[in-house]
A protein has these predicted regions:
Chain B
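Thiamine diphosphate
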Residues: 259, 263-285, 289-292, 484-491
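Glycine-rich loop/linker segments at domain edges
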Residues: 53, 58-65, 175-214, 306-384, ...
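Catalytic phosphate/nucleotide-handling subdomain of diverse soluble enzymes
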Residues: 458-512
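Helix-loop-helix junctions that connect adjacent transmembrane helices in secondary transporters/permeases
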Residues: 166-244, 398, 402-470, 490, ...
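Flexible, low-hydrophobicity surface segments
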Residues: 1-174, 273, 588
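Short acidic, glycine/serine/threonine-rich loops at helix termini
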Residues: 142-145, 236-238, 264-270, 299-305, ...
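FAD-binding core of FAD-dependent oxidoreductases
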Residues: 161-162, 254-273, 299-300, 332, ...
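C-terminal catalytic domains of large/alpha subunits in multi-subunit enzymes
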Residues: 2-22, 104-105, 245-252, 282-290, ...
Length: 327, 750
């Protein structure tokens, strides 16, 4: 076993200093990292436990400008139940947090950890398979292998899907994220957290070594804003989505004045679908309109040998999310 | 009850009283001749104090609180941990195996080869060598230093493309001609309506929560093994034979298996992990623990095999089945056996019938028995075929069953279940045109036949009564969680007429009398009469002591309701037991052969019904409710019996909708060998479940009980598949019924 040092920081500065050292991984709840280390898929020299920083990095608060500040270490249960989030505009966040994994996991798992998840691809996650994203081989094995849970959209040379179910609603709500790196804070649009070109060699996120996500920010939603998150699965208890959709619409005078639509679990990144969203704007909600948006959301899809069902299912999930958001 | 031994013919009443809401008892008289010394038979008229009531599981609290110690929990000072090196190659030959470097690694105490150079490697996961060391990290490091090389051969893990697999068309239907049979051709030609369809099921793994393995400890040439097993005595013999070189015999081996975290048919043998454990402990001269990890459990300990099945058949103008032709192909792993499929035979008594099965070998872990081996697969295919045939003939599925089912017990069960479930109304309910959610109901029969291991007098039970009034009932057989301890306690307390709290049942130590493996639903019918006989003998001894004490003739002393005595001269149980002295009453009951006379019924009957709700947009199937009626002979502990039935229904939901082994064809390796991607039904996926235990006095031995491992496992997936057919008005002929298949069925229907 490769020995590793375990850092329990007293404050963010100490965590950041440790995080900057080579061959270091950051641990939130450790829901997945502990498993990967036990399986020796990840063998860092140093693990920095961020949980002692919960006092400064956890919690939900409404800021003066009406935005919602979500600490990176806020648990999914806190997110689901927090009083500041009981608002129809933020329904998608609560729905997503509340349907993740199991109550045990939700009580422990953190918001940042959920967004920064490593792929669940079964080729990547077994050292027996020499695949490119796993760093063990020349190509993606899932493209030509068993790919019923893999990508149908936005893939280049690796058909992994991004497993986060909080990322789609946060993107749909226009969220930003703050990081700290070498003493500097930066706040950017959430989309920048994901690689512009999700190639096999790229990690799931764009964080630099030593960079720590400290918070998410959901901007103040306009009057009439509503959101919804839906996902398809093969079972209701503890399963990953086969497709997911988060939508945010602003309803004015019975019409959709603005819309955002983001797909999850269908590509290597959570995927904003601006053309589908644009088709909704200026229209009154209707089944036909939602069908049209669903078709646009999956326009250009490139399914694999075993996952074309995701197109049918995914379109249904888009329609359902739009229906729930405009009901 | 009189404690005198009957030696002559006894007249008993067998059968059952009318089910609730039905008229007419189905009772018959039988004359039976119990063996000399056996307890007199219980029958349909017996009034029980305890049997059939809602007692709690006797070890439920110990299990729920963690006090129960499973093999996984056993630990000793200085105990080593161990792992097995597994083949990454699905087929080939071991060409090099160097263990020296591993043996020199820090913390490593023993390394053993499990294959020799030149041996065949049969599947990904085949055991090559094993290492024991001070902790799992050290062991894993050493495993990584073992140099194993292979001469790799071409492999195949898809039985549908095996050399002798049948031709299949693009829709998955067998396209090969049926073998010629003039009689069958004629029967099909005469039929008014015929049907022909292909069905398929995927591989399900047992997924016991406690994995295979255990702890071994040697003391000189004596070996003790705490083993997670369904067959303590089988494993004892297996290990003794395998370890003959270590100068031991069967008498030197003791197996302990007091609590087992599930087996479902996968744990009949000690296996390579059991042998490795003992070899390592011998070599290291220290206790060794070796428990498989979840991936090994999924990939090396057997499975319920996949199968491709085709049926064709026809009905006459009256809706009676006149022809039934069946062929099936089972995936059978490298052993090329164990993939067989069973189908119901009670619908086709007057039909021209043919059944063929062929096992197809692939380079993968072979099947092992799993709850009603072959049955859930075959019943799925056969019962869905019957519903499709009934639909073509324009007959309601229930009417179709009633027209064709030749078993009286199930005729009553069909009607009872239909009433309870509200079949007619649910079946008549039409889905609104264009509705997103589609509802449907379906049904299936079940059958399993086993009345114990008669003629195995070696199977026995020890019963002890102590002077403090406590009672022990002991079996060396194991209990993989099914309720055996509770069953033994209830039988013993009933026979002695004492409070259940005074009885302590212990199982799983091979120093106690032998019992069967937990397979084929044989434990309850094998051991319940032995437990009763043991209590019966112990009671006689107590009666004799009391008779002597009271100065009355022993023959007329009774022991019931916590009192022992004659007429007005009665001692309380506690007082009577004080006469026993320091050594307990200590007797051994035996399992006599079943009575010569015909039992009321030779097998167990059941019926299940299911309702589903399908999201036609996403293809997601939710089972909303299920009802089952199940016969198991005499119901001994009602709540536990129901738990066995409900558990089987849950496993059936999982089999019908979720579970499947997914293999990577190129590497021959399972892709979803964990509990994240191998999907097992969880609480939010469960329907409302209800069952009715149909207690039948069977009259085959002094108790008349049958087991419940198999019988309730047969029908569930078939009933769900039929409900899906009803909801969609199109069949999904391939388990598990995942959303992609539902959408395909809807698209094909148009």
């Amino acid at each position: 076993m490769k020995p590793f040092s375990y850092v329990v920081p007293k404050d963010l500065a100490e965590a950041a200093a440790a995080a900057a050292q080579p061959d270091t991984v950051l641990k939130g709840a450790g829901v997945d990292l502990v498993d990967r280390m036990k399986e020796r898929l990840q063998t860092p020299a140093q693990v920095v436990n961020l949980l002692p920083l919960r006092r400064e990095l956890a919690g939900v608060a409404r800021t003066a400008d009406g935005a919602v500040h979500i600490g990176a270490l806020t648990t999914l249960t806190e997110l689901e139940q927090h009083a500041e989030l009981q608002d129809p505009a933020l329904q998608a966040l609560r729905q997503s947090a509340g349907m993740t994994a199991t109550p045990h996991v939700r009580n422990r798992a953190t918001v940042a950890g959920n967004i920064l998840q490593f792929t669940r691809c079964w080729y990547v996650r077994s050292e027996a398979f020499h695949c490119l994203h796993g760093g063990r081989g020349p190509t993606c094995l899932a493209v030509t292998g068993e790919n019923r849970y893999h990508a149908v959209l936005g893939w280049l040379d690796c058909v992994r899907v991004h497993p986060s179910n909080l990322a789609p609603p946060l993107l749909a709500l226009g969220a930003e994220y703050t990081t700290t790196l070498a003493g500097k804070e930066r706040r950017r649009a959430l989309a920048e957290l994901f690689p512009a070109e999700p190639r096999a060699q790229n990690p799931e996120h764009t964080l630099l070594p030593g960079e720590i996500v400290t918070a998410l920010h959901v901007p103040k939603q306009p009057a009439g804003a509503r959101s919804a998150y839906c996902e398809s699965r093969e079972k209701q208890t503890f399963d990953w989505a086969t497709t997911a959709c988060a939508v945010r619409v602003v309803l004015q005078g019975g019409k959709i004045a603005a819309a955002d639509l983001v797909l999850g679990a269908v590509g290597p990144n959570p995927l904003p679908r601006p053309k589908a969203a644009a088709a909704l704007v200026g229209e009154a909600p209707s089944a036909a309109l939602f069908q049209k948006a669903a078709e646009l959301a999956f326009a250009g899809a490139n399914p694999l040998a075993h996952n074309d069902y995701k197109l049918t299912v995914g379109k249904a999930i888009v329609r359902q999310a739009l229906d729930e958001a405009t009901r | 009850m009189n404690a005198r031994t009957p030696q002559e013919d006894v007249k008993i009443r067998v059968g059952y009283k009318a089910l609730p809401g039905q008229k007419g008892d189905r009772l018959e008289e039988r004359t039976v001749k119990p063996a000399a010394g056996d307890a007199p038979p219980w029958d349909a008229m017996t009034q029980f104090a305890l049997v059939g009531s809602d007692v709690d599981r006797v070890d439920g609290l110990a299990k729920a609180s963690g006090r129960a110690k499973y093999s996984y929990d056993v630990t000793f000072p200085g105990m080593l941990q161990a792992m097995i090196l597994r083949s990454p190659v699905p087929r080939g030959k071991l060409t090099a195996l160097e263990l020296d470097e591993a043996a020199r690694m820090p913390g490593v105490q023993a390394v053993v080869a499990l294959k020799e150079v030149g041996n065949k490697v049969r599947f990904v996961g085949d055991a090559i060598a094993a290492v024991a060391g001070v902790n799992l990290h050290a062991v894993r490091d050493a495993i990584e230093r073992i140099r194993a090389e292979y001469d790799r051969e071409e492999h195949n893990v898809d039985y549908l493309v095996a050399d002798d697999a049948p031709m299949v068309d693009e829709k998955g239907a067998i396209s090969e001609d049926w073998p010629a049979d003039e009689g069958m051709t004629a029967a099909l030609l005469e039929a008014k309506v015929t049907h022909d369809a292909t069905y398929r099921v995927e591989v399900q793994t047992h997924s016991s929560l406690e994995t295979h393995g255990g702890v071994a400890r040697w003391t000189g040439n004596d070996l003790e093994v705490w083993l997670s097993t369904q067959a303590t005595f089988g494993c004892r013999g297996e290990l003794a034979r395998a370890l003959q070189g270590k100068k031991i015999d069967v008498g030197s081996v003791t197996i302990h298996s007091e609590f087992v975290g599930g087996g479902f048919g996968s744990k009949f043998g000690a296996g390579i992990e059991g042998l490795a454990l003992c070899l390592l402990a011998h070599a290291a001269k220290a206790p060794v623990k070796l428990m498989l990890d979840r991936f090994e459990e999924h990939t090396t300990t057997g499975n319920r095999p996949g199968a491709l099945m085709q049926a064709r058949g026809g009905v006459d103008a009256e809706g009676r089945i006149v022809a039934w032709d069946w062929r099936s192909f089972g995936h059978a792993g490298f052993s090329a056996s164990g993939g067989s499929v069973a189908v119901p035979n009670y619908y086709t008594a007057d039909a021209k019938v043919r059944r063929n099965h062929k096992d197809l070998a692939i380079d993968a872990d072979p099947p092992r028995p799993m709850r009603a081996p072959g049955h859930p697969q075959g019943w799925f295919g056969a019962e869905l075929f019957l519903d499709e045939l009934a639909a073509k003939a324009g007959v309601d599925p229930l009417t179709f069953r009633l027209n064709n089912d030749r078993e009286q017990i199930r005729q009553d069960q069909w009607r009872f279940a239909a009433e309870r479930f509200g079949w007619a109304a649910a079946r008549a309910r039409a889905n609104e045109p264009g509705a997103r959610l589609l509802r449907g109901v379906g049904l299936s029969s079940a059958r399993w036949g086993n009345l114990g291991n008669p003629g195995r007098p070696a199977h026995g039970i020890t019963c002890r009564i102590h002077q403090d009034g406590t009672v022990e009932t002991r079996s060396g057989a194991q209990e993989p969680g099914v309720g055996t301890k509770t069953m033994l306690s209830v039988i013993t307390a009933e026979e002695l007429g004492v409070d259940l709290k005074l009885v302590k049942a212990t199982v799983g130590h091979t120093g106690d009398p032998s019992g069967p493996a937990s397979g084929g639903s044989t434990v309850t019918p094998s051991l319940a009469p032995a437990a009763r006989h043991a209590a019966f003998l112990a009671k006689q001894q107590l009666c004799e002591l009391v008779a002597k004490h009271l100065g009355v003739p022993a023959a007329n002393v009774t022991c019931a309701g916590g009192l022992v005595g004659l007429g007005k001269e009665q001692l309380r149980w506690a007082e009577a037991c004080k006469l026993i002295g320091p050594n307990p009453i200590d007797v051994r009951g035996q399992r006599f052969a079943n009575y010569d006379s015909k039992p009321f019924h030779g097998s167990q009957c059941g019926v299940q019904m299911a309702e589903v709700e399908i999201d036609s947009w996403t293809g997601f199937v939710r089972v909303t409710r299920m009802f089952g009626i199940q016969d198991c002979g005499l119901v001994i502990a009602r709540k536990l019996a129901e738990s066995q039935v409900l558990g089987a229904m849950i496993q059936g939901v999982s089999y019908a909708l979720h579970e499947q082994r997914i293999m990577d064809k190129r590497s021959g390796r399972m892709l979803n060998g964990d509990f994240l991607r191998y999907k097992i039904t969880g609480v939010r996926d469960l329907p409302e479940l209800e069952c009715h235990m149909h207690s039948i006095a069977n009259g085959h031995d002094s108790v008349g009980a049958a087991g419940l491992g198999e019988p309730p496992s047969v029908a569930s997936a078939a009933a769900i598949a039929n409900a899906v057919f009803h909801a969609l008005r199109a069949p999904v002929r391939h388990l598990p019924i995942t959303p992609d298949k539902v959408l395909k069925a809807l698209a094909q229907k148009g």
